[in-house]
Amino acid sequence: MKRYEVIGIVLTLLGAIVWGGSGTSVQFLGNFRNMNLEWLITMRLITAGLLTVLYAWFRQGNSVFHVFRSARDTLGLIIFGVFGMALCQYTYFRAIVLAGAGIATVLQYLAPSMIIIYMLMRYGKRPSRGEIISVILALVGTICLMGNDGFSFESFRGDVLFWGLLSAVGVAVYSVSPVRLLATYGTIPIVGFGMLISGFLAAVLFHQPHSYAVWDVWTIVGCFNVVFLGTIVSFNAYLEGVKRIGAVSGAILSSVEPISAAFLGWALLGNQFNWIGILGMAMIIATIIIIALERRKPQPKRTENANTV
């Protein structure tokens, strides 16, 4: 396995882990500080987007705006922001409201299967045995882990399936669509502009100008974690990892996010999990090992487009 791919695996895992940590902060802000979560989603995307674009501008100058010189790339950026970032977050939020985080998370983690189907139909790329096993383990492991969060198959109603599956589509688009843009313009500017696009769309959809939160030092700490670690670091790390190891492996490895959320919820908020949850963690960790072993095998030559996603 090349060093380039090792870094990609580490970055993908880092992005998923800090995203899970931000979920604990969101739970704290919503449950203990009465924060309007729609306001929080809008605020974190716009704030993180502005900070990310400013950072990219300080590093790269006006070249960060070169993506807008191409109509094709501008359209690709809009697709990434609207049908990737914004879609996966808004629909995930809707699924949580209707059925709880457990069902919403399980449905969202159908994304790796969707990516594999897309790769097969678009490029004729058949999934490896390791990828198929990893997708199954990740999905079953997530179901086991979410069993501690009130997961019940009775909650699978038509509206829940609609929003949950749309959330998975959003994750798939978010993982696949920007890869060429990331390689051309760099991860940071593309992620920053994608956040701004999705943030402004969230402002229009939610129209929530007030947080209604109880503000103290811990509210500020929670917001900092959500914006900086859970948005800026997690999005940039995950997509840089996807650029290095591909969308399928990246989406599978992102299933460590529920483990991170479960551990932090247990340590900081007193959440509990049983042996079924531990079994789910073991299954998800097994996917990391399988992906790493897959990467050690000689990779067959692929077409340029298929290899970039």
PLM features per residue range, with description:
Residues 16, 43, 85, 89, ...:
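Helix-helix packing/entry segments at the starts of transmembrane helices
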Residues 4-9, 33-42, 67-73, 147-170, ...:
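Juxtamembrane helix-entry segments on the extracytoplasmic side of multipass membrane proteins
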Residues 108, 124-144, 154-161, 216-220, ...:
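Loop-to-transmembrane alpha-helix entry segments
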Residues 1-43, 153-180, 200, 303-309:
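Glycine-/small-residue-enriched transmembrane alpha-helix faces in small-molecule transporters
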Residues 57-102, 144, 227-245:
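Specific transmembrane alpha-helical segments of multi-pass solute transporters/efflux pumps
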Residues 47, 51, 107-121, 136-137, ...:
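Alpha-helical transmembrane segments of compact multi-pass small-molecule transporters, enriched
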Residues 1, 45, 146-148, 219, ...:
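C-terminal-most transmembrane helix of multi-pass membrane proteins
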Residues 21, 28, 48-70, 139-155, ...:
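Membrane-interface helix-cap regions at the ends of transmembrane helices
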